[in-house]
């Protein structure tokens, strides 16, 4: 049985879906005002891998990941670029789709956009106002945190803890909010900004309400899994829970999953430190599969440390797996141990999707394959396990002239003409073909 570390309970929980054989997942997507950075990619890749493992286990997955296309940063960026907000966000949605495709990420079942759910957002806020979970003040609408009895349980905090922390804060909204912790559901329009008509005047939604509306509209009042980066635990996911459960009276999500950060040379990635790395730029020099494989080297909840060496190691290891995949089939080989590797891999992934341990099993399997156990059945299974990590290798086909050289070398060796055999081997090496003589015949890999 798959076990998931649930942030809400701070413990491993058996995964029991709402509907047998089906999984509903909602993962917070990007705010589309710039190219995604490697930290954003960690979340995308982690939850794509989790989705793929569910599908490998036979589940039908309804995977929803949104685009936040109404936001202060988008308004600011569009104004600086001299573009309207939709054209500006469209540009970075397209860039996002290109980047994640290069990382081998499967398309989501649906990528909802905030601008397509404005009526539903307004209706959601109206219900909260009617139930007195929210109040209007000067054209803004705020959620009344004091009515949410388990507010911030997800972040393992109490309302009292948060109120103490907020007591020294002063902001422009402080005078009109009942409580410093109350958060905006609807923001009144400012001059020159994009806005929509509402019962409280022209305005636009707050960030947190957007995900609650899209998740419940598409997946229903209660969903199986809600995921995102660890930075979203508070306040974003905390506020999603408060407003969603206030509206429906039901548990919003049964499992909360949060992925760890990406550090750069053991430092937090930030623009101020100058170590901010976008996937768009990284793809100019590093293959997308290498980036993805690097991100999978740690279990999704743990931080990943980005270094040039770590990426290089991922490239070398991926090349080894590719060369293993392209070994010649030996149908008469003994493959009885195959099920042991599959069982070990599933054990690793069932334990809260431990990709690090899963990859260890894959390398043990590759070593076993290289020792002469590569049947068609083994190759098919090897490919299935790699695909869970988004790794798909193409069959390597040698040019006819290279195949001819390999055959000529075999003839030279058979005739004990080792000088000719060595010359052909060196010639092939210059073309990137490395030969390995084994008791079962010659093998080749592309260097």
Curated annotation (Swiss-Prot):
An example molecular function term from Gene Ontology annotations: cysteine-tRNA ligase activity
Annotated compartments: Cytoplasm
Lineage: Bacteria, Bacillati, Bacillota, Bacilli, Lactobacillales
Source organism (scientific name): Streptococcus agalactiae serotype V (strain ATCC BAA-611 / 2603 V/R)
First-level EC class: ligase
EC number: 6.1.1.16
GO biological processes: cysteinyl-tRNA aminoacylation
Protein name: Cysteine--tRNA ligase
Enzymatic reactions: tRNA(Cys) + L-cysteine + ATP = L-cysteinyl-tRNA(Cys) + AMP + diphosphate
Intervals of motif 'HIGH' region: 30-40
Pfam families with a match to the protein in the record: CysS_C (PF23493), DALR_2 (PF09190), tRNA-synt_1e (PF01406)
Record SUPFAM superfamilies: Anticodon-binding domain of a subclass of class I aminoacyl-tRNA synthetases (SSF47323), Nucleotidylyl transferase (SSF52374)
């Amino acid at each position: 049985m798959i076990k998931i570390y649930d942030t809400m309970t701070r413990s491993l929980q058996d995964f029991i879906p709402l509907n047998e054989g089906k999984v509903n997942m909602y993962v917070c997507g990007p705010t589309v005002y710039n190219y995604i950075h490697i930290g954003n990619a960690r979340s995308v890749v982690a939850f794509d891998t989790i989705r793929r493992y569910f599908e490998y286990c036979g589940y039908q997955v309804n995977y929803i990941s949104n685009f936040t296309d109404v936001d202060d940063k988008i308004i600011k960026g569009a104004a600086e670029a001299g573009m309207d907000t939709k054209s500006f966000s469209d540009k970075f949605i397209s860039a996002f789709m290109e980047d994640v495709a290069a990382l081998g990420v499967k398309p989501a079942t649906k990528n909802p956009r905030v601008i397509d759910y404005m009526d539903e957002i307004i209706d959601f806020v109206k219900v909260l106002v009617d139930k007195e979970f929210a109040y209007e003040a000067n054209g803004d609408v705020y959620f009344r945190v004091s009515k949410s009895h388990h507010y911030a349980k997800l972040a393992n905090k109490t309302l009292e803890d948060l109120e103490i922390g907020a007591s020294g804060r002063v902001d422009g909204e402080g005078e009109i909010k009942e409580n410093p912790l109350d958060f905006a559901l609807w923001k009144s329009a400012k001059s020159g900004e994009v806005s929509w008509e509402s019962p409280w005047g022209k305005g636009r939604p707050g960030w947190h309400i957007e995900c609650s509306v899209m998740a419940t509209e598409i997946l229903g009042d209660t969903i199986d899994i809600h995921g995102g980066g660890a930075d979203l635990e508070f306040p974003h996911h905390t506020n999603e829970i408060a407003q969603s459960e206030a509206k429906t009276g039901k548990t919003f999500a049964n499992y909360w999953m949060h992925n760890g950060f990406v550090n750069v040379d053991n430092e937090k990635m930030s623009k101020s430190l100058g170590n901010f790395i976008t996937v768009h730029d990284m793809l100019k020099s590093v293959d997308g599969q290498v980036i993805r494989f690097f991100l999978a080297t740690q279990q999704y909840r743990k931080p990943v440390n980005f270094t040039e060496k770590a990426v290089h190691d991922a490239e070398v290891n991926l090349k080894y797996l590719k060369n293993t995949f392209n070994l010649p089939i030996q149908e008469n080989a003994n493959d009885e141990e195959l099920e042991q590797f599959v069982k070990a891999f599933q054990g690793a992934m069932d334990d809260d999707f431990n990709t690090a341990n899963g990859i260890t099993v894959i390398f043990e399997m590759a070593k076993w394959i290289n020792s002469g156990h590569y049947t068609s059945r083994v190759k098919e299974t090897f490919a299935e396990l790699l695909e869970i990590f988004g790794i798909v290798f193409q069959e390597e086909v040698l040019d006819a002239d290279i195949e001819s050289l390999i055959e000529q070398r075999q003839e030279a060796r058979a005739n004990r003409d080792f000088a000719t055999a060595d010359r052909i081997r060196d010639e092939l090496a210059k073309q990137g073909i490395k030969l390995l003589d084994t008791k079962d015949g010659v093998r080749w890999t592309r260097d």
